[in-house]
Structure formats: C-alpha cells, structure tokens
C-alpha cells in the first residue's frame, strides 16, 4: 500500500507543479484522499511520514535530553495542583507517571494549604479504563447544585470532543446504579433538578448542524429511556456556532434558572429562559454571553452594545438583569452596568461568590481582579484585590456558599501560584506556588510595540537573556494566535523556560488583532475579509525584532496552533523571507474546504464562507494550501496534528504536507495518533510532541554544536 501511495503522489506531481506556477492561488485539490481521518491509505501515509520525521528529529543528539526534561516536568510530583470548590472540599484532576490517564481526587482547604496535602482518590481513570478495556480520557464533570454530590462525568475515547456521560456519586465514589448515562456524542447538558436533566445531542442520525453539533434540547428524567425524552426546544440544522446548549445557574440564595443558548453564527446567539410552561427568548444582544448569577441578578458579558437601561451599555462591558423580572417579561429586560472597560482594557472573565462579583480585568495586557458589590440604589463599587503587578491574573473558582475565591497569578518569569481571596473584605493571600522549573534570574521581560502596515500600534512581550547583545544573532521564537477574541497574556511556561530560555533563546508573544486583548473592537478589526491586518500585525512584530537587531531571519522561528496554525501557514506562504523555522500546530490550512472538514462550518463568523463570492476570493488569496509555490525558497516547517482531532481535524496538515512533498519542498510532518485537538492524550505523548518541537527549533535556529544543557 505504501508503494501505491508513493505512485499516486508522483503521478500528481506534474499537475501540482503546473498549477503552482500561476500568479494567483492554485485552487486545485489533488489530496482529498487524505481527508479520510482513519482510512487505510491515509493512515499508511501518516505512518510513513511519522517514521521519516522521527529519523530526523529523534536522531538529533539533543532530542533524548529534551524529551527527558519535558517528561520530567510534565510528571513532576511537585507540580502546582489546581483545584476547584465542590461540596465543601477542593477537587483536582492529576496525571503523573503512576497515573497516566489520571485520577480525580479531593482534599480539604486546610490540607491544601499545607506543604503535603492529604488527597483522597475519588476516581482512578487508569483503573476504570483497564476494567472496561476502554481508551478513556477525562473531559471533566458537571455536578448538581446545591450539594454537589451527584456529578455527570464526561469521558472521551482517545481525546475526541465527542464524549460519553455517566452519573457518579462523589460521596460513595461509585457510578450511580440508576444514574444518567448518555452514549458517545457531541453533547451539552444541564441539571434541572436531582432527577431531571436537559440534554442537547444528536437524538436521531443526522440531527446535527452543518458543523456537526446538536440543535435539539430534550428533558430527560431519571430512569427514562433516551427515546422517551421530551423535546422542549429546537434550533435549526442551519445554525452556526457550536450547537444549542442548556445551562443552569444557582446562586447562594437559592435562585435557580436554566437557560438555552442557540448559536446563530460563530459569535452570535439567541438566549432563552426555561420557564415552567415554555421557553422564552430574552432581549439580550446576540453578541453576549450569560456567565453567572448573584443575588437573583444574572451576569452578562457583552461583545456588543446593549440598550434598554438608563443608558446604552458599551460592547466589552459587564451587565446584570433581574431574574424575577425576566421570568415575567423576558422580552423587555432592563440591564444595569457593572463595569465598562476603557480603551486599553478588557474583561477576561466574571464570577460570582455569595454576594460579590469578581471581575478579571486586563489593562494593557496586565491582569488584575476587581471585587464588585451592589449598593441599594443599583450602583456598583469596585475594589482591586491586592495581587502582584505586571502578571496575568484570573479567577480559578469561587465558593457560592461563602465569599471565598481561588485566584491564579502567573508571569513569564513568575512561577504560577494560587491565591485565596476573601471577596467580602477584598483581601487575598498566596497559598500555593509551583516550584521553579528554570533559572528566571538569567532573563528579563519587556513590553514593546511594533507599527503595523496601517499605522496601528501592536504590543508584544519579549523575554530575553540579561545583557542580550543586539546583533541579530539571538535564536528567537515568536508566538501569536490572532483570532476568536482570545487574549494572549503572560504565563509561566516550564517548557519554554527550561527548553528555550535557559538554552539562550528569546521568546516573544505578540498581541495582534483578532484577539481580545483590547476588547471586541480589537477582535472585529480582523474578521472575515479584513483578516489581512492580523497577518500584517504579525509580520510587523517580526520586522521590528529584526530592525532592532534582536534577531534576524536566519535566527527567527514562529509558532502557533489551531487558528494560530492558520496564522503560521499564512506567514509561511506570504513572508517566507522572514523565518528559518515555522512550527505549524493542529492547523487550518485549506481555507476553501474548511467548512467541509470536521467542525469548520462553525467558524464562518470568524473566517467568512466560500458561498459568498467576496469572502471566497479573500479566502483563496490567503489559504496556505492554495498559495504554496513550487520553486519558492521556503524554510523547512514542522507540521503536526492529531488523528483524534474531531474539531479542526488532521486533514489540513496532511494535505499541506503532501502538496509540499509533491512540489519537492522540504518539510517535516508528525501526527499524534491520540489526543484530540492538542499534543497528546497523556503526559508521555505530550512530552514527545514538545521534544520534537524544541529539537526542531534548536536545529533550525541554533548552531549545530549547541548542545542542550539539562
């Protein structure tokens, strides 16, 4: 079969080369056979490519040491255990060398604050997988409030987004005998009561949207067969986004509300309130999200202006509406503003405690957390928690039975830590810090700005050695994402620190348009046919690094995944002169067929659609797969993906690599067989992928004699 694949590849060579010589994009597609995720021919091609890449990267004298360091850090016993409040205790999911798939465990707050917490195992996924001969990967839990004793556990086959759901009792630590069980699927669920849940899933074959997500919500009672579940809401098969989803909010006073979110596009959705006898649509902007509830007031995070209150509430703000009023008059909500960010601010998240709100705010890409409380006249006061400055901060979890919250603090050179906050007093204290993984004293962090092609100032962080000589010789990795209003903020990354910074490398994170660093407007500036500004921003940062002699094209590498993988592909084809290494992670690359591959149709709101002529023309102009040129001098990229990725899919990466092969262009390709939309299903697989990446960067950007120093 391998010979058949090789023969077909070379038979297509002349066609590919001929098409690749035109000035415009090459819209031919001779590698659709690689779109079969698990097809025999496709998998044989994958195995051949994996073996070829292994002979290059794993044979490098640096690889073994890099892999060992990555695995040791991934499985270290003194890693920081992040926890969440559940039933009066703290729960954590943990993986190490003895628990490859992981254990779900718990401890008390007092014990967690000690140097050596006493953990009780609630569920051992390794033991469960062995007993059931299943390839289980933990995907989380949803526990019924109040009490939080009964939980719906999500278990995935190999890391896919699709999962199996089973009810579990955390007190007895057993699956519930008459519990809820939902077979494998992309599904959404919400507790209505201890004996009733709402479920959105593919009830009958084909009852999914174009993107493969559910659009029908049914009520399922304990002991009731799936076939007998009662439909309460139906969207449409033509809906965009990520599927119709139910969600239940409960506050400390016992107020309870179940909502249904119906996505119409990637960023727009209708919000509905489940009432005793019907499901009523709420008068909330389509670009907004219901996020929590406190004291009978429902929190909404806005990406569009909301009118209807005393004054218009701007996009990017946080607002509330009264639940009791919504139950009476869902179509005439009167919102109150809680917080409206300034021009260089954004809201990263909102959480409720018993009677306070915690707002995660970024000011010029620096984090802080504000405690908000409501006065009797409806005004809100905000007090910052006393947290470190010039770092990233965020709320990990809150306890609605009290005013406690767990807050994360992290920075490029600041080991991640957990802080315990008291929202009623607006105080916070560090209670757990991860052990340093690299010598941060050798490095320094700067925040700088580049000027994009249209004059926009684009901030970026640069982490470099103390006393760095600006002579263009510094090996540099530039990272960005640039899409979906996702913010890239400073964080302590042990792999980057140990495997790159300690080895003398420079790391750069760019806050380009398309992200959410400065609110919805920063994101919307790069939507659909306006997307070229995202790529111009990234190139501007690279050119600034070169102009200031931090690095040079010979020493500059770039990295990005998923939508960031598309960014990498565009930079690879538009500006091959700027880079000597391009790490393309789980990417989108065929932008003329992305709507037909996996969940791609759900992202039309971000990228546009080939069904719209203007948008198709733009997509063709940027699509990396269609803009490869035979005879062009490209750097050798590392392209990697995963077989089990049922979100973006491995098809984009496979086809891009195959086309490069047919054109006689140098490349390295690796496909992880498990792991979903990520680097692997367990620590060993993830460490292997990480080692391949940093070995690749060392080969491309550092001198051959430069050895890895553990």
Residue ranges of model-derived segments:
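N-terminal Sec signal peptide cleavage junction
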Residues: 19-21
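Non-catalytic accessory segments flanking enzyme active sites
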Residues: 44-143, 154, 242-303, 308, ...
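Beta-propeller blade signature
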Residues: 105-109, 166-171, 213-224, 271-276, ...
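Asp-box/WD-like beta-propeller blade repeats and closely related beta-sheet repeat scaffolds
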Residues: 118-140, 150-155, 159-196, 200-211, ...
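Blade-edge beta-strand/turn elements of extracellular beta-propeller
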Residues: 119, 170-182, 224-238, 274-284, ...
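Cap/lid segment of the alpha/beta-hydrolase catalytic domain
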Residues: 126-147, 155-162, 171-179, 388, ...
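Polar, glycine-rich mid-to-C-terminal structural blocks
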Residues: 214-262
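Active-site-proximal cap/loop segments of hydrolase catalytic domains
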Residues: 496, 502, 509-710
């Amino acid at each position: 079969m391998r010979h058949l694949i090789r023969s077909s590849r070379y038979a297509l060579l002349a066609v590919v080369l001929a098409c690749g010589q035109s000035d415009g994009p090459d819209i031919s597609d001779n590698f659709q056979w690689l779109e079969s995720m698990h097809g025999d021919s496709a998998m044989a091609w994958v195995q051949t490519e994996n073996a070829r890449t292994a002979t290059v990267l794993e044979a490098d004298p640096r690889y073994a040491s890099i892999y060992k360091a990555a695995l040791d850090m991934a499985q270290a016993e003194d890693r920081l255990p992040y926890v969440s409040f559940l039933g009066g205790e703290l729960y954590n999911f943990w993986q190490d060398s003895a628990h490859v798939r992981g254990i779900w465990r718990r401890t008390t707050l007092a014990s967690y604050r000690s140097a050596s917490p006493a953990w009780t195992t609630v569920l051992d996924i390794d033991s469960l997988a062995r007993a059931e001969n299943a390839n289980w990967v933990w995907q989380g839990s949803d526990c019924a409030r109040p009490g939080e004793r009964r939980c719906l556990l999500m278990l995935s086959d190999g890391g896919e987004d699709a999962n199996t759901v089973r009810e579990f009792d955390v007190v007895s630590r057993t699956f519930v005998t008459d519990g809820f069980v939902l077979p494998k699927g992309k599904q959404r669920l919400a507790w209505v009561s201890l004996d009733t849940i709402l479920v959105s899933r593919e009830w009958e074959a084909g009852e999914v949207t174009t993107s493969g997500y559910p659009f029908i919500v049914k009520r399922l009672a304990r002991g009731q067969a799936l076939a007998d579940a009662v439909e309460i809401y139906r969207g449409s098969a033509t809906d965009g986004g990520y599927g119709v989803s139910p969600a239940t909010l409960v506050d400390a006073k016992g107020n309870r509300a179940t909502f249904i979110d119906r996505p119409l596009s990637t960023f727009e959705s209708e919000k509905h309130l489940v009432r005793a006898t019907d499901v009523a649509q709420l008068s909330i902007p389509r670009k907004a999200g219901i996020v929590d509830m406190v004291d009978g007031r429902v929190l909404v995070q806005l990406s569009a202006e909301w009118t209807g209150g005393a004054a218009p509430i701007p996009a990017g703000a946080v607002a509330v509406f009264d639940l009791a009023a919504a139950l009476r008059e869902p179509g005439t909500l009167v919102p109150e503003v809680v917080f409206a960010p300034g021009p260089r601010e954004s809201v990263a998240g909102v959480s409720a405690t018993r009677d306070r709100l915690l707002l995660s705010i970024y000011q010029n890409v620096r984090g802080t957390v504000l405690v908000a409380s409501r006065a009797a006249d409806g005004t809100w006061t905000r007090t910052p928690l006393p947290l470190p400055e010039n770092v990233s901060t965020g709320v990990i979890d809150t306890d609605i039975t009290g005013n406690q919250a767990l807050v994360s603090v992290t920075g490029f050179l600041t080991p991640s830590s957990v802080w315990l906050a008291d929202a009623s007093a607006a105080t916070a204290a560090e209670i757990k810090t991860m052990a340093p993984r690299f010598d941060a004293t050798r490095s320094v962090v700067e925040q700088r700005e580049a000027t994009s092609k249209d004059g926009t100032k684009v901030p970026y962080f640069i982490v470099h050695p103390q006393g760095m000589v600006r002579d263009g010789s510094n090996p540099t990795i530039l990272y960005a994402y640039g899409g979906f209003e996702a913010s890239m903020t400073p964080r302590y990354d042990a792999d980057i620190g140990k495997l790159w910074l300690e080895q003398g490398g420079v790391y750069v994170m760019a806050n380009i348009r398309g992200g959410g660093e400065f609110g919805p407007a920063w994101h919307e500036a790069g939507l659909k046919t306006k997307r070229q500004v995202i790529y111009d921003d990234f190139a501007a940062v690279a050119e600034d690094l070169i102009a200031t002699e931090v690095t040079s094209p010979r020493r500059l590498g770039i990295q990005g995944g998923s939508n960031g993988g598309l960014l990498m592909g565009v930079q690879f084809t538009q500006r091959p002169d700027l880079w000597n290494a391009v790490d393309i992670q789980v990417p989108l690359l065929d932008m003329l067929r992305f709507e037909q591959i996996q969940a791609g149709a759900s992202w039309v709101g971000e990228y546009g659609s080939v069904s719209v002529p203007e948008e198709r023309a733009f997509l063709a102009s940027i699509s990396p797969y269609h803009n490869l040129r035979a005879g062009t001098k490209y750097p050798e990229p590392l392209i990697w993906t995963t077989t089990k990725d049922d979100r973006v899919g491995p098809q984009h990466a496979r086809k891009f690599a195959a086309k490069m092969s047919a054109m006689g262009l140098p490349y390295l390709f690796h496909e992880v067989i498990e792991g979903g939309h990520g680097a692997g299903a367990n620590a060993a697989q993830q460490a292997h992928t990480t080692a391949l990446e940093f070995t690749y960067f060392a080969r491309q950007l550092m001198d051959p004699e430069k050895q890895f120093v553990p």
